[in-house]
Design a protein with these regions (language model features):
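Active-site clefts of carbohydrate-active enzymes
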Residues: 260-301
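Aromatic- and acidic-residue-enriched segments that line the glycan-binding/catalytic groove
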Residues: 19-121, 217-225, 340, 344
Length: 596
């Protein structure tokens, strides 16, 4: 994929989360999934749970409990690497609680039925254990830096560290999730590792506020520019143009030039309300209770909001930085805050005019270097509804004017003072021209839209391949209902208890019922709570090994829904005698009879 993208001048940037992991990852392994898969490394949770159980039940010291834990896991599971146990804080004196403040108990593994020991979860979510920051820095935690960032940060040859491995496979950089929650020291070393392989590898941090400290050359190249989002949307919703320009100017003055021109200028993302819905009054609020009633659709979105999206897109494609379009915005996708903002792409259902607008703006930006790398000079006027700036380089000088009101506006600008000396200007969007005689120009700026003026003699022919845009709006490309994946909603077992004699086997796969019946991915996996009593293979074959009880947990691969079957194993019953239904039998020649 990466090679194919490179052939068409596209690049892949990998999304990286470096301060927390999934609770079912190999690093933490809360559900004991990796103990039996042959790996020589143990996750943090099984290890510390064993240690704390031993301390409590055997009344021994932590040191002795750790010694016994390593002896046990090495002997039983072949574990030789205990590095991940140092990456997390698991607490012996706290347990996880549910919403009712009741203790959460382990349902699988060695501790089935026992309370889950507490640990720090990202923003309180126990599904995402936090990497420990030793002395305030993840970089100083155990082997984390070596495994994640690399053994030799200056080597031009990639190692198997997380950071360098994926770059060596064709990735062109990293987007760092919740970047402000990781130490500066960690990112400084991370940068060395990334840039050692290729100085063009990009590093983009998720920062929602002023990011100047991250952009001084020792951490990131760019950030997700949420401050641009704030300025652009506030203006589009009727805010004073001066306030928007002041916000943008503060960024330009504070950020290093190299970073300023590389800003990831977004107006929405997977963490916000979608642009069109935000313009229609649905704010960022993951806890909103009225979403069922306010469920946004394109049809019930106001015409004003739809028109304002054209204005926001114009600012994105004409201002300094990298215009970043959240998938589907160009089609008119709607959505409230996370998770509603992550709906599936609406292929073939988008607004044709909007799709073509985004494509045209992209083509214009590609055609004029001034809009990509040219200088930026704000144009302040007396009309708070008109926002303007000049983009210029050695090739062109361009005046961008925008109007956030519901009515067209006639605007007069002294272009000579801005360095534009042409006698006639033209709008590169529409091709309409206007006189600049006397150094001033009067132009009509359309409602909720704008113009891009430049010397008429410098106007370039900009074309868009509309045929390639059809998947966005042509119903022929609409995904048919039968092609959509049907998500699993649950799993149950026809029999929740079975009894087996020692040495016998039974298959429980026929008892598994995945809902709904037409789910796309009905695959499940099996796990036993005690393999010494009853083991289970990937096909659901249960083998009774010793007298006792064990719980077989069935988990769907789609959605991770679970159901349980209790297995009771009894001693093998020895036959005391054999009895036949007949003790005497008379048969005619050629006849048969089956004894029972």
């Amino acid at each position: 994929v990466s090679r194919g993208l490179g052939d068409v001048y596209k690049r892949q940037v990998l999304d990286g989360v470096f301060n927390h992991v999934s609770d079912d990852s190999v690093y933490f392994d809360r559900y004991y999934e990796y103990l039996e898969d042959g790996t020589d490394t143990i996750g943090a949770y099984p290890y510390w749970a064993y240690v704390y159980d031993a301390m409590s039940e055997k009344k021994i010291s932590k040191e002795e409990a750790e010694k016994q834990a390593k002896e046990y896991f090495t002997a039983e599971y072949g574990i030789t690497n205990y590095d991940y146990t140092e990456w997390f804080d698991v607490f012996s004196d706290t347990t996880l609680k549910d919403d009712n403040d009741d203790e959460v108990c382990d349902s699988v593994g060695l501790r089935a039925g026992k309370p889950v020991y507490g640990y720090d979860g990202w923003w309180g979510y126990d599904s995402m254990p936090i990497i420990k920051a030793t002395n305030g820095s993840e970089y100083q935690t155990g082997t984390w830096a070596e495994e994640v960032i690399g053994k030799n940060e200056t080597s031009k040859t990639a190692d198997n560290s997380v950071t360098q491995y994926w770059l060596s496979k064709g990735m062109d950089g990293w987007r760092l999730d919740v970047a402000n929650e990781v130490s500066d020291e960690t990112w400084q070393h991370f940068r060395k590792s990334v840039k050692a392989l290729d100085s063009d590898n990009v590093i983009i941090g998720e920062i929602w506020t002023d990011a100047v400290k991250y952009l001084m050359g020792d951490m990131y190249d760019s950030v997700m520019n949420y401050m641009f989002r704030g300025a652009a949307i506030a203006y589009a919703k009727g805010g004073d143009s001066k306030n928007a320009l002041n916000t943008l100017e503060r960024l330009r003055e504070r950020y290093p030039k190299e970073a300023f021109y590389a800003m990831m200028n977004l107006v929405d993302s997977h963490d916000t309300t979608r642009l069109l819905s935000y313009l229609d009054g649905i704010d960022d609020d993951r806890n909103q209770k009225e979403i069922a009633e306010a469920f946004p659709t394109y049809e019930n979105t106001s015409d004003a909001a739809k028109q304002k999206q054209y204005l926001v897109a114009l600012m994105q494609f004409t201002y300094a930085g990298a215009p970043t379009i959240y998938y589907g915005d160009e089609l008119g996708m709607v959505g409230a805050d996370d998770p509603d903002d992550r709906r599936a792409m609406i292929w073939g259902e988008g607004n044709e005019n909007l799709v073509k607008w985004y494509a045209k703006l992209a083509a214009i930006r590609s055609s004029y270097s001034a809009l990509r790398t040219g200088s930026v000079e704000p144009v302040y006027g007396t009309d708070k509804e008109i926002l303007g700036y000049v983009r210029s380089d050695d090739s062109d000088i361009m005046l961008v004017l925008m109007n956030n009101s519901a009515a067209d506006k006639s605007v007069t600008v002294n272009v000579a003072e801005l360095g534009i000396n042409a006698a006639e200007l033209a709008d590169v969007i529409t091709g309409n021209s206007c006189s600049a005689a006397g150094g001033s120009v009067t132009v009509n700026v359309p409602a909720y839209n704008g113009v891009i003026l430049t010397d008429k003699g410098h106007v370039k022919q900009v074309s868009v391949d509309e045929e390639n845009l059809k998947p966005g709006f042509d119903p022929a490309y609409k995904i048919k209902a039968e092609e959509r994946a049907v998500k699993v909603t649950g799993v149950s077992l026809k029999k929740t208890e079975i009894t087996l004699q020692k040495g016998k086997t039974a298959n429980i796969s026929e008892n598994v019922v995945v809902a709904p019946q037409n789910a796309t991915n009905t695959a499940v996996k099996y796990k036993t709570s005690d393999k010494t009593v009853a083991s289970v293979d990937k096909d659901g074959n249960v083998t009774a090994n010793a007298k006792g009880t064990a719980t077989i947990t069935v988990t769907t691969k789609d959605g991770m829904f679970t159901s349980e079957c209790k297995v009771t194993v009894g001693d093998q019953v020895q036959a005391a005698k054999i009895k036949l239904n007949k003790t005497k039998l008379s048969l005619k020649k050629g006849k048969t009879y089956t004894l029972k």
